[in-house]
Amino acid sequence: MATTRRIFCSQAAAVLLIPRLLLSQTKSTSRPDVAAIDHDRILESATHYLTQSPSPITILPCSRSPGTLNDFYSEAENYWPDPSNPTGPFVLRGGTPNPDAFNAHRDALLNFAICVPALTAAFVLTNESRYAQQALVHLHAWFLDPATRMTPSLLYGQTIRPAKTGQPEGVIEAVHLSEVVQCIPFLTNFEGFAESDLAAIKKWFAEYFDWLNTSRLAGLARDMKNHHGSSWLLQAASIAHLNEISDDAPLTTLRHQYKSSTIRAQIVADGTFPRELTTPNPYRNTLFNLDMFAGICVLLSTRFESVWDYELQDGPGMRTVIARMFPYIQDRGAWPYRADATHFNELPIRPPSLLFAARAYNRPEYAELWKTLKPDPVSPELQRTFPIRQPLLWVTRPKP
């Protein structure tokens, strides 16, 4: 059949459209439908928490705490009594955790930080008020009720007995609050969320942000060149992001900190976190740190500036780090460093860093791998290193 001018033009137009069509397909596969993928998982978890009453730290007293009932208190579980000095400072002993170490506040805070995002995600999916109402019940107990609210500090976190103050490492025990902060803009769409309660919750986080920035203990955590420093930055960034509309200066400061010091302090030329590789659980802590870095990038990026793309002149950024870890998330057996001391075979859990990086870098292979991995850790030890459980709250824009 002879080629007419019309046929030729149609074929030429089709050829020209192919790259655009392929690009649109790539974009769609690098941005999976998180609401559809996690729908059943979210509702199952939220249904469980619909009937769970709050467990604030005030109902879990510890006679060894130097603070009040409202003060968070935990003890470093790798420290034991010194046999040569029974009344002296506890000494570090690796391996088996000390079963006498008090960590009920840590566990209660973790449960709270799993509960509220699950309920909020269910509210986002269904718009059913019962989920938002139950989330507010827990928020009220932890942040508003004077009798049960937690003091907005971690002054006594990871205390080494018989000391009367905590350690910088204690700040990481509140890293899960970062996802609780993500819930607040979504819950404001619930008509039962009183303006006064919203203001009081924001005030609690503002006071905690102030503690993070003025406390000597928190300052030491901020300056640590490993996952403890990342934990500080993720917490600070989440609160600054919450209050960005009223004051964007803190977020700008944190963005500068990430670009000027955090990357340089933690990432080396081959895209690894060298300080995580020296820990007893290098694989787990690398994934933990990567997830926190990814959350930080989500919070600090704007329509005009993506910190995902920032790289040092003499070193890499997040693009290199995620590319470096990708094959080891695909195949744990390819991990070239020593295996973790515990729970190595239970990893990887579905890392939010893969999903966020897929969206940031238009890498569908990251999203495809993310979809295949189990979403939730079972072991409490692993749960403590998994601060982002509801990615729906991180990739969805709240309704104004």
Outline where the language-model segments fall.
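N-terminal export signals
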Residues: I7-S24
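Extracellular glycan-targeting catalytic surfaces
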Residues: A13, Q25-A221, P274, L299-F304, ...
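Short acidic-aromatic active-site loops that bind/stabilize oxyanions
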Residues: H105-L109, N226, Y283
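Alpha-helical scaffold elements that line and support the substrate/ligand-binding pocket
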Residues: C115-L125, L233-I239, F293-A294
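An alpha-helical repeat/solenoid feature that recognizes helix-turn-helix modules
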Residues: G170-E173, G229-W232, T286-N289
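Eukaryote-skewed repeat-based solenoidal scaffolds used as protein-protein interaction platforms
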Residues: T188-S260
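Long, repeat-rich segments with strong aromatic
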Residues: S238-G333
